[in-house]
């Protein structure tokens, strides 16, 4: 039996993790969760899975749940509550499925508590990869990727030595607007942006997919997860999202991981690693039915956010923190209808250009840079 905490239980990754726990009651038990403000969802999870601890981000939701479950479930609040859920003593694996940089400190505390990390919050490594990976090594903790692309690379590298790797290739669908010109992108709507052709995901990551910032963040995450320089990390457009990523070795051999676009697969693999279990209600891959797979080179002028991510990643230091914070604020403004789609990349670039570089920022400096960048982007609105 593995005991699971889910940070971000009401989101897309969180709810799919619950599906897996539900499907394998003899393998997994839910011990702790965090939610934002969805009281009904929290009630449903408590009634079905009986977690020992529930962390709540929003004050009104916290007060409601605390009064309802007094003496039955420990209800905790805010960042301290999130940290408590992450480091819960009875937990073996922490699924970090919260969105954004809010996941950084709880992930570090979970690592310090010796928990295995099922990493779905890519911003943790983007903003503080040097700190997180050093902490994981110090405490002997595994960082198991949940992103489909990183899970694919992780699977392709099983039994292989890193010095055999020529490069890794992350595939990208191209998102909602892959066939639109730059001119057409000027007037796209939020509703259009949220229609991803292949994957069912949360709003923020769907917009990131449309701008290709999601792939840029994944490039930075891959740099830290697999300890490879950016020159050995490529991106390939692949419309069908069947090949989730590839590894090319020094002898020119290529190993790829294939599957239908279903996030249950990489989530379950992170929970069961190194074992594999049957996946309930999964559609097996039928290549004859699909018949044809397509691949294209990435146009970095077309996908400016991906270029910005490569540049920030290669520069390192504090720039990835600025990249991430500026992107989060700009995407939020776009989702609220306050800025145009292409203004997202404009605000990110402006934030990067004005930032005073810090080479190896401390955790406190990262938090200050994150907050200052957010204030700057909000001032542009």
UniProtKB/Swiss-Prot annotation:
Q: Per UniProt, which keywords does this protein have?
A: Isoprene biosynthesis, Manganese, Metal-binding, NADP, Oxidoreductase
Q: Does the keyword Lipid metabolism apply?
A: no
Q: At which positions is NADPH bound?
A: 10-13, 36-38, 121, 123, 202
Coiled-coil spans are none
One of the protein's GO biological processes: isopentenyl diphosphate biosynthetic process, methylerythritol 4-phosphate pathway involved in terpenoid biosynthetic process
Lineage, top-rank taxon, reads Bacteria
The reaction(s) catalysed by this protein are: 2-C-methyl-D-erythritol 4-phosphate + NADP(+) = 1-deoxy-D-xylulose 5-phosphate + NADPH + H(+)
Q: List the disulfide bonds.
A: none
Q: Which Pfam families match?
A: DXP_redisom_C, DXP_reductoisom, DXPR_C
Q: Keyword Cell inner membrane: yes or no?
A: no
Which annotated residues bind 1-deoxy-D-xylulose 5-phosphate?
Answer: 122, 148-149, 173, 196, 209, 214-215, 218
The biological pathway it contributes to is: Isoprenoid biosynthesis; isopentenyl diphosphate biosynthesis via DXP pathway; isopentenyl diphosphate from 1-deoxy-D-xylulose 5-phosphate: step 1/6
> Known EC number(s)?
1.1.1.267
Under the heading InterPro entries, the entry gives: DXP_reductoisomerase, DXP_reductoisomerase_C, DXP_reductoisomerase_N, DXPR_C, DXPR_C_sf, NAD(P)-bd_dom_sf
HAMAP family registered for this protein in UniProt: DXP_reductoisom (MF_00183)
**Per its UniProt record, what PANTHER family does this chain match?**
1-DEOXY-D-XYLULOSE 5-PHOSPHATE REDUCTOISOMERASE (PTHR30525), 1-DEOXY-D-XYLULOSE 5-PHOSPHATE REDUCTOISOMERASE, CHLOROPLASTIC (PTHR30525:SF0)
Similarity remark: Belongs to the DXR family.
Provide the protein name: 1-deoxy-D-xylulose 5-phosphate reductoisomerase
| The organism of origin for this protein | Geobacillus sp. (strain WCH70)
């Amino acid at each position: 039996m593995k005991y699971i905490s889910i940070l971000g239980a009401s989101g897309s990754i969180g709810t799919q993790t619950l599906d897996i726990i539900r499907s394998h009651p003899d393998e997994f038990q839910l011990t702790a969760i965090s939610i934002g403000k969805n009281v009904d969802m929290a009630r449903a999870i408590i009634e079905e899975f009986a977690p020992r601890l529930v962390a709540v981000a929003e004050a009104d939701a916290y007060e409601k749940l605390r009064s309802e479950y007094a003496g039955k479930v420990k209800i905790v609040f805010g960042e301290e509550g999130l940290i408590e859920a992450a480091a819960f003593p009875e937990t073996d694996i922490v699924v970090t499925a919260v969105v954004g940089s809010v996941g950084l400190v709880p992930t570090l505390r979970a690592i310090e508590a010796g928990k295995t990390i099922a990493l779905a919050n890519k911003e943790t490594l983007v903003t503080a990869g040097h700190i997180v990976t050093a902490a994981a090594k110090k405490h002997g903790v595994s960082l198991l990727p949940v992103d489909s692309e990183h899970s694919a690379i992780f699977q392709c590298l099983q039994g292989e030595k890193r010095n055999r790797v020529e490069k890794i290739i992350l595939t990208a669908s191209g998102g909602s607007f892959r066939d639109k010109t730059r001119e057409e992108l000027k007037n796209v709507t939020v509703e259009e942006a949220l229609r991803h052709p292949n994957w069912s995901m949360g709003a923020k990551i769907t917009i990131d997919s449309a701008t290709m910032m999601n792939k840029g963040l994944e490039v930075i995450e891959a740099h830290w997860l697999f300890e490879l320089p950016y020159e050995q990390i490529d991106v390939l457009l692949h419309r069908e999202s069947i090949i989730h990523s590839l590894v090319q070795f020094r002898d020119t051999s290529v190993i790829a991981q294939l599957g239908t676009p279903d996030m249950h697969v990489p989530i379950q693999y992170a929970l069961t690693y190194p074992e594999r279990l049957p996946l309930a209600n999964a559609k097996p891959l039928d290549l004859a039915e699909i018949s044809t797979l397509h691949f294209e080179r990435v146009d970095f002028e077309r996908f400016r956010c991906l270029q910005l991510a490569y540049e920030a990643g290669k520069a390192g230091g504090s720039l990835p923190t600025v990249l991430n914070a500026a992107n989060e604020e700009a995407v939020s403004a776009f989702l609220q209808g306050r800025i145009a789609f292409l203004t997202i990349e404009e605000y990110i670039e402006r934030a990067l250009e004005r930032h005073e570089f810090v080479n190896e920022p401390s955790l406190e400096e990262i938090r200050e840079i994150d907050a200052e960048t957010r204030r700057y982007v909000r001032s542009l609105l």
